[in-house]
Amino acid sequence: MAYTPKPENKFSFGLWTVGNIGRDPFGDPVREVRSPVQLVQLLGEVGAWGVNFHDNDLVPIDATAAERAPIESDFKKALDENGLVVPMATTNLFTHPAFRDGAFTSTDPEVRAYALQKTMAAIDLGVECGASTYVFWGGREGTETDASKSPADTGKWFQEALNFLCEYVMDQGYDLRFALEPKPNEPRGDLYLATVGHMLAFIETLDHPEMIGVNPEVAHEHMAGLNFTHAVAQAWNAGKLFHIDLNDQNLGRYDQDFRFGSHNIKQAFFLVKFLEDVGYDNPRHFDAHAYRSSDYEDVKAFASGCMRTYLILKEKAEQMRENEPIQALLAQITEYDGSIEGFRGKDSSEKEACIKAH
């Protein structure tokens, strides 16, 4: 097998992933800045299907209307020339100093209003570029000390913001759905809605839960020491797996965003197997980063490697499904003779009595 990515694989990368210049809290950038057009060209060369962006990955936060127009025009032209689409967009609500104590959960109502304004404009930009999924990662929605604000209040503010934005999308007639991305910590000491389970419960408290799903990320669940495949399965069973972020991570560490499958190959295999077994057909987004020691040629190899790893694991999953000894063992351990069929399904008083008497 050639392991060549195809459009039906729906492999995508963020501008911030292949465009990462290698800055970290302890070191300066190690790669030069590449423009969105250059990054689209890079992704076209490696055979990616899609490219995603935060609003300010594409348009600088201080750009004027006159400056913005050619940026958008050049980006759309690059998409066409390189055969890429924009499946997802999102808002940067974490870099600007205004968001240092939260965006939708800031104690300052003016900051919360600014977060809504910025997100509405970013939604417009994303839809204009073709996005059908809009991700919310609350990078500053949290605390270092719970003395600073009540989680009861911040939960209500977060609900109000998402309810407002759902109504905005409906008022505009956009064909867009939201995907909430959990993370346990970083950059805040503790982030609200830390895991997939938290997000699934939160979604059901909103006014339009049918519009909202989740965007689980391998690294984020592994930071909490959880089994990512189980989290993905829970989201799938709830009908909420709208998007997924693929990378790799040592359990219990800071957010490492390693190349997909580079550390936990067994977990990566069972994740790919699950996605392929259930027929997941939404974007497969590699929210990962090349090593800081990499140049841009290595960034290209990194991007190709993410997709190649997925395709290799997909092939291995197919081999497992077709392996007769393995399937015979699975059939043996799940064998059922029908002897308790009368107890299965919806509860009734008769079934309760039968189970007690069995």
Task: Mark where each language-model region is.
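Glycine/proline-rich, flexible active-site/cofactor-binding loop segments
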Residues: G126, Y134-G138, A152-N185
